[in-house]
Amino acid sequence: MKLRFLFAFLALTLLPATLPAQTAETSGKPFVVEYYYKAKWGYADEFLQLFKKNHYPLLKKQVEMGRMLKVWMDQPRYHTTEDGRWDYRVTIVFKNSTVANEPFDEDAIKKQLWPDQATYLKEEQRRFELLLSHWDLPVRTMDLEGK
């Protein structure tokens, strides 16, 4: 019993000391997130049109600001099973993990890019109504030549 308390005490006191070192090590490197979109059958083109009109300009603005380094979209060349199907994958390379995870106020940019907020909000709602699912996947590149 005493050994368990000692272990818990050591874990709680030593663990926080290792976290800043890990964060500092990775915070300077680009941070990549893949965003997957699976549209309802027959609505992928409408989703893409709304994405390009109402979301891509916001992403491009963040690239211009330096928050993101690069943004691109991929589409599968061939079909797959329904459970594994996705229609679009947007890959965003953030400047670093800190920038990717800290709060960012997009509202001012949205109001600048889309002064007619009522139309913008209606179209954004429609864009998400067209989806069956959407998921985000942070990824890291593996060095196959290293250890």
Pin down the residues of each PLM region.
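Bacterial N-terminal signal peptides that target proteins for export
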Residues: 1-7
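Bacterial N-terminal signal peptides
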Residues: 7-17
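Boundary of Sec targeting at the N-terminus
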Residues: 21-22
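An amphipathic, aromatic/His-enriched active-site/gating alpha helix that lines ligand/cofactor pockets
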Residues: 26, 61-69, 83-85, 91-141
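Acidic/histidine-rich, surface-exposed loop or edge segments in extracytoplasmic proteins
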Residues: 27-42
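Primarily extracytoplasmic ectodomains and periplasmic/lumenal surface modules that are beta-strand-rich
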Residues: 41-46, 98-100
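Short amphipathic alpha-helical segments
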Residues: 43-70
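A cross-kingdom feature marking solvent-exposed beta-strand/loop segments within repeated
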Residues: 75-79
